[in-house]
Amino acid sequence: MRQATVTRNTLETRITVSLNLDGSGQARFDTGVPFLEHMLDQIARHGLIDLDITAQGDLHIDAHHTVEDLGITLGQAFARAIGDKKGIRRYGHAYVPLDEALSRVVLDLSGRPGLEYHVDYTRATIGSFDVDLFSEFFHGFVNHAMVTLHIDNLRGINSHHQAETIFKAFGRALRMAVEPDPRMAGVTPSTKGTLTA
């Protein structure tokens, strides 16, 4: 099974992420950031990734450190679980609509971290959640999962819908990229022979 557990403790946050890339979308969260948990649930359910995440952070200041560090820890767990990447599809993409909103996510498990994030939210907050923190989450993830990730919200009026289409598409793109390719069994999907940058 491709699974991993990572604990990351700093003076600002204490976070544990357990994931199973070959799961069924089961999820349990205790982060103190409800809207983020709603988005993480989209990753689990649409990516068929089992996620168990606990986080304690300096939420008396704001959610910035918790959200960013959660992205970092999730990226570390993902990198550990995916291993040497032999026999996987490597690339993943998805378009996901929700009513008026439409987002596209494309990723490459390349070993080279990079984020292209093109989202213009129609509001600065969703409930009490600062939408700027989504970018921090994805930056943390790509820098520690060592993936290239392109996120484009193509249209949307409702900020909740914009965010939800992004996270659903991210989950589906991950599912595609990590899926074993029976024609590539035991083979690294790169002409370089490695996907470690």
UniProtKB/Swiss-Prot annotation:
Signal sequence: where?
none
Q: What class of enzyme is it?
A: lyase
Which GO cellular component terms, listed alphabetically, does the Swiss-Prot or TrEMBL entry include? cytoplasm
Database matches in InterPro entries: IGPD_sf, ImidazoleglycerolP_deHydtase, ImidazoleglycerP_deHydtase_CS, Ribosomal_Su5_D2-typ_SF
Q: In which pathway does it act?
A: Amino-acid biosynthesis; L-histidine biosynthesis; L-histidine from 5-phospho-alpha-D-ribose 1-diphosphate: step 6/9
Q: Where in the cell is it found?
A: Cytoplasm
List the catalytic activities from the record.
D-erythro-1-(imidazol-4-yl)glycerol 3-phosphate = 3-(imidazol-4-yl)-2-oxopropyl phosphate + H2O
Instruction: From the UniProt record, give one GO term of the biological process aspect.
Output: L-histidine biosynthetic process
Q: Which Pfam families match?
A: IGPD
MF terms in GO: imidazoleglycerol-phosphate dehydratase activity
Q: What is its main location?
A: cytoplasm
Record-linked SUPFAM superfamilies: Ribosomal protein S5 domain 2-like (SSF54211)
Please state the Enzyme Commission number of this protein.
4.2.1.19
Keywords associated with the record: Amino-acid biosynthesis, Cytoplasm, Histidine biosynthesis, Lyase
- Family (UniProt): Belongs to the imidazoleglycerol-phosphate dehydratase family.
Tell me which HAMAP family the record gives: HisB (MF_00076)
Q: What is this protein called?
A: Imidazoleglycerol-phosphate dehydratase
What is the primary gene name for this protein?
hisB
